[in-house]
């Protein structure tokens, strides 16, 4: 393991105007201040934590995103995942951000970690590799992503939980047959950007360190499969839109700096880019700019956009109606991806789509 520290949204004039105004006045200048990664005293020792399958020749992976509500839909999705786990056990999970709705945790001992993560995921007893989302870094309004230090509480919680795995804001985990690289794109995709902060701003110390680390980690990885996880997607047919056009906002609020980062440091270097943020499930293909890296969106573990595809990117599968999750069966030569739907009136998951990727 390598670690490194330092409701559906709709496009609308009011929100766009507010956000642009916040950016213009430098509202985030004081919110993105330099700070070290939080370190909690903790109660979950390395010995008690659910073990990582670090030398696995095959993996069964649960993929969820935007899960942390603590409400009935989240429980329905995790109940469906437990049905699969009972017959074909998972080795680990990827949690793609927005882990604690609506405004993130107040600290590493916040009871929301229990009500919105531990209790809903009871019985899914394996490591959960967690990604920071915009709601996890809230400053002023839910999901603005403007208080980046708030996310450090989730890093500190790593030392208090058996299943929550987030040793730093960005990190990598070698898993034998696959290497996973969890990124923090929040400084480049916040609705209230960290202007005037040399630590957090685009081109600042934090993103420069993260880029250098990622370049080195991907270059030296010898795993058959390389999986990158972000909260914000590069490509997206849902209402949030893709990087460079998030929510129809002007630059830099539209994620254009994230778009450039992914194109420079991820595209063509990893096999998969898994993201959440949009409350939908999408299996996209042949995305221009990604140079063969496959964009997968799974952000429907507790919410649904109840919309339809914008059709901006070619898709093998899309669902904007149901909540759900994905599973991966990985060996040295193939990855079998399956999308599962969890309808409100259903007693279990529906296997909606499956596809196989080969080396």
Identify the meaning behind each predicted range.
Residues 13-29:
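N-terminal export leaders
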Residues 66, 97-98, 133-134, 183, ...:
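Active-site glycine-centered loops adjacent to acidic/histidine catalytic or metal-binding residues
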Residues 42-112, 237:
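N-terminal active-site segment of His-dependent metallophosphoesterases
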Residues 55, 82, 89, 101-226, ...:
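Extended active-site neighborhood of metal-dependent phosphoesterases/phosphodiesterases
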Residues 317-359:
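A short C-terminal boundary segment appended to hydrolase-like catalytic domains
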Residues 61-63, 93-95, 130, 228, ...:
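Residue-level marker for buried hydrophobic side chains located in beta-strands
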Residues 1-13, 27:
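N-terminal secretory signal peptides
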Residues 29-49:
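C-terminal region of N-terminal signal peptides and the immediate post-cleavage residues
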